[in-house]
Amino acid sequence: MTKSVAIIGAGITGLSSAYFLKQQDPNIDVTIFEASNRPGGKIQSYRKDGYMIELGPESYLGRKTIMTELAKDIGLEQDIVTNTTGQSYIFAKNKLYPIPGGSIMGIPTDIKPFVTTKLISPLGKLRAGFDLLKKPTQMQDGDISVGAFFRARLGNEVLENLIEPLMGGIYGTDIDKLSLMSTFPNFKEKEEAFGSLIKGMKDEKNKRLKQRQLYPGAPKGQFKQFKHGLSSFIEALEQDVKNKGVTIRYNTSVDDIITSQKQYKIVYNDQLEEVYDGVLVTTPHQVFLNWFGQDPAFDYFKTMDSTTVATVVLAFDEKDIENTHDGTGFVIARTSDTDITACTWTSKKWPFTTPEGKVLIRAYVGKPGDTVVDDHTDNELVSIVRRDLSQMMTFKGDPEFTIVNRLPKSMPQYHVGHIQQIRQIQAHIKQTYPRLRVTGASFEAVGLPDCITQGKVAAEEVIAEL
């Protein structure tokens, strides 16, 4: 008898889950329920007058190869693009400083660029050197904040001016609350293995160099995109699973998931009902609490903070903007008096996105705990971005157009202890809800390849239990 699985959510995790379900069992009956009118979730590519603009995620990390492999499987191998490499900067102390060469996420691995940078004072550099002498950092209950860990290893100055701008922005979380073991456990592993974070990351750098030497003609950039945007990946994945028999229902809100020992009843669109053997839930926690909120095991998600952010895109004629910094973008130290947290010079990092003679800039607004995105109109956010960017470049005219995309409560914050909570919840789900999995960014996926990996694992686990 044919088994059936319902997937809630047609974002990258949900579509990937459908792909891997069909890969495991081509005969399985798969239906995706999506409340909106399109697939992709936060992924949204916008094409206008020769521009290709990402309103959500901009790219993915190439060394997490599962997304590249999946792209090849669905026919997009020739569309994969690698970013143009160039200098990245940190805005601190009212100035743009080049990120020291050889550093990995701000951690120095080459002595000369670190010693000569003006971003860190001589005393701050000396303090960072104590990492070579310190014993491994003690954790309480198996976790520690990113801030406490790097402050102990490299000192406060390196933390504030190098580490925090690079790491804090990825997760939209105060680094003194951000869980190390939920986000960057590899740094703790390197510290334990080598007795020093600097030594450990130097080893990591050497491994990457050796890997690159195996493929001398490969592009040097870390990030991948598609020449028609990330939405082209979503569209190809959607078409692939539909060709394999997956049904996708858009504009379909799930009202409830009713459990039983043998099957799950999906209640949708005001009391319509269907029964499935298995369920994969891939929505944000604010949504899945509607169905699991009565279960005390899910109480952790009721107190989980999420940061609201916005991307602000500005398109200029190149004569109307002067930028003396040759690079691909910058991040901002939290000690700086700005509302933006980072900026990508998109036309330099991804030249294919921008017509000849034009400049495309993408700025990010929204810090943990602030309300700047909620408190201002789109026009006001554009003005705020231009005000902040005027500290780094000169505007000689107005942008040809601007786009503001708000992402309300889109970045779940992984506070210290998060990974332990998630493991307990996942164990509870496996025990209490057989053939059902809940997955997505609220658990442990932030990058796009991580979402695909979670979808694959969830699909394989449900298949094994059917």
UniProtKB/Swiss-Prot annotation:
GO biological process: heme biosynthetic process
Annotated localization: Cytoplasm
Pfam families: Amino_oxidase
Cofactor entry: FAD
Residue sites binding FAD per the record: 9-14, 34-35, 42, 56-59, 254, 446-448
Enzyme class of the recorded protein, top EC level: oxidoreductase
One term of GO molecular function: oxygen-dependent protoporphyrinogen oxidase activity
Keyword Membrane applies: no
Pathway assigned in UniProt: Porphyrin-containing compound metabolism; protoheme biosynthesis
Reactions listed under catalytic activity: coproporphyrinogen III + 3 O2 = coproporphyrin III + 3 H2O2
Entry's Gene Ontology cellular component terms: cytoplasm
Cofactor note text: Binds 1 FAD per subunit.
EC number: 1.3.3.15
Regulation (activators, inhibitors): The generation of protoporphyrin IX, but not coproporphyrin III, is stimulated by heme-bound HemQ. This stimulatory effect is mediated by superoxide. Inhibited by acifluorfen analogs.
Entry annotated with the keyword Signal: no
Top-rank taxon: Bacteria
Swiss-Prot/TrEMBL keywords: Cytoplasm, FAD, Flavoprotein, Heme biosynthesis, Oxidoreductase
Function: Involved in coproporphyrin-dependent heme b biosynthesis. Catalyzes the oxidation of coproporphyrinogen III to coproporphyrin III. Can also oxidize protoporphyrinogen IX.
Family, per entry: Belongs to the protoporphyrinogen/coproporphyrinogen oxidase family. Coproporphyrinogen III oxidase subfamily.
Name of the featured protein: Coproporphyrinogen III oxidase
Primary gene name: cgoX
